[in-house]
Amino acid sequence: MPRSALLCCLILLAGVAASRDQGTQSENSCAHFPASLPHMLRELRAAFGRVKTFFQMKDQLDNMLLTRSLLEDFKGYLGCQALSEMIQFYLEEVMPQAENHGPDIKEHVNSLGEKLKTLRLRLRRCHRFLPCENKSKAVEQVRGVFSKLQEKGVYKAMSEFDIFINYIEAYMTMKMKN
């Protein structure tokens, strides 16, 4: 066998071994994910606690944005998609507007957003927790109401962020039992 062919084979085998080891690391982090979830949810709740009073004081609306139908979607066959869409909704629509309420609020909302991004990244790496494609009607309803509320929608969505964390917890608890 020529040296160049032998060298190519060795490089290929090294690449396959490295790839397999990386897959094992990813699987290991997924194995530990259920144990780290309570800590991640506590961090989300603590980060939200820094802005909760501000947004709940500004929320003058009596109706709920995050309704029971959203929780039912989280618990049903659309749970994965509902969770994915709601994380995207908060990161792309709610939090950018929520950051416009002063430097202190911006800092805390930004921190909350980073923790939510970390959760989303961990969920995506562990495909059994976020393997989805379908659209959730309940999330579409939340988005529609949020848009109609205009500026008040930010106060409403941020004031109910703790409900969103509870829905995440309900979804993840259900997935870990399966």
Curated annotation (Swiss-Prot):
Gene Ontology molecular functions: cytokine activity
Disulfide linkage: C30-C126, C80-C132
Keywords of this entry: Cytokine, Disulfide bond, Glycoprotein, Secreted, Signal
InterPro entries in the cross-refs: 4_helix_cytokine-like_core (IPR009079), IL-10 (IPR000098), IL-10/19/20/24/26 (IPR020443), IL-10_CS (IPR020423)
GO BP of this protein: immune response; negative regulation of B cell proliferation; negative regulation of cytokine production involved in immune response; negative regulation of inflammatory response; negative regulation of interleukin-6 production; negative regulation of membrane protein ectodomain proteolysis; positive regulation of B cell apoptotic process; positive regulation of cytokine production
Gene3D superfamilies named among the record's database cross-references: 1.20.1250.10
Keyword Secreted on entry: yes
Glycosylation sites: N134
GO cellular component: extracellular space
Main location: secreted
Position of the signal peptide: 1-18
Localization, UniProt: Secreted
Top-level taxon of the source organism: Eukaryota
UniProt keyword Glycoprotein present: yes
Subunit structure: Homodimer. Interacts with IL10RA and IL10RB.
Role summary: Major immune regulatory cytokine that acts on many cells of the immune system where it has profound anti-inflammatory functions, limiting excessive tissue disruption caused by inflammation. Mechanistically, IL10 binds to its heterotetrameric receptor comprising IL10RA and IL10RB leading to JAK1 and STAT2-mediated phosphorylation of STAT3. In turn, STAT3 translocates to the nucleus where it drives expression of anti-inflammatory mediators.
Family: Belongs to the IL-10 family.
Protein name: Interleukin-10
Encoding gene (name): IL10
